[in-house]
């Protein structure tokens, strides 16, 4: 009996010591005695409003040094638009440190997302302004492949003074591309790079300011078709002879042309080929 009483007394003594410690560490009592008085924010970010960040962090900081839930605060910050990742730490006696990594947009992806320079997809933030970005698209697992062809396409069309504004791959793997002068190009599924090389090589010969190209279809083994804008605004198939090798109806045969890929660097293209920056 005496042994039982001794054990019970020992447990009560331990509880009396442990409960205050647990209460303090969980913020049940004394939170106001160890308040987090300072917020220290770091990171290279420009689009996350400081007021919005402060409003998200403040409720967690009020719980005090011992009771603040760092992971919950970190998750809340990461849900803000433009935030790629966040780290939250506390430093004795009263500092809450927040490090924010912001998404750096590279392109629009599909209808409602963007692709960052790190190759991550994220929702398009609301009230997006002043962003002139290329329109890319495709299966989520194909982002590297889409970006690689985008970079190569820019190099191919750079000598013509044109840029690539749109490049998309559909669910079947078929490619389409839009140039800065409004020309829409259907590439198809196979040999996309070779087909674009052929078209870019002869594009200067097809220039006609009076009848600009509206659309090109490259889904042919040895050539392509071209539709031009007519004076009435409509488009039609190009049947006018060009100083190029003999052509089948509506198709320019390119077997006899010697093709070269221009050795160019792409300005303002943050992706390395074939992968993303790390």
From Swiss-Prot:
Coiled coil: none annotated. It comes from the Bacteria. Residues 34-103 form the POTRA domain. Keywords: Cell cycle, Cell division, Cell inner membrane, Cell membrane, Membrane, Transmembrane, Transmembrane helix. Residues 1-6 are cytoplasmic. The chain crosses the membrane at residues 7-27. Residues 28-278 are periplasmic. PROSITE patterns: POTRA. It is found in: Cell inner membrane. One of its GO terms (cellular component) is plasma membrane. GO terms for biological process: division septum assembly; FtsZ-dependent cytokinesis. It is a single-pass type II membrane protein. Essential cell division protein. May link together the upstream cell division proteins, which are predominantly cytoplasmic, with the downstream cell division proteins, which are predominantly periplasmic. May control correct divisome assembly. Part of a complex composed of FtsB, FtsL and FtsQ. Belongs to the FtsQ/DivIB family. FtsQ subfamily. This is Cell division protein FtsQ.
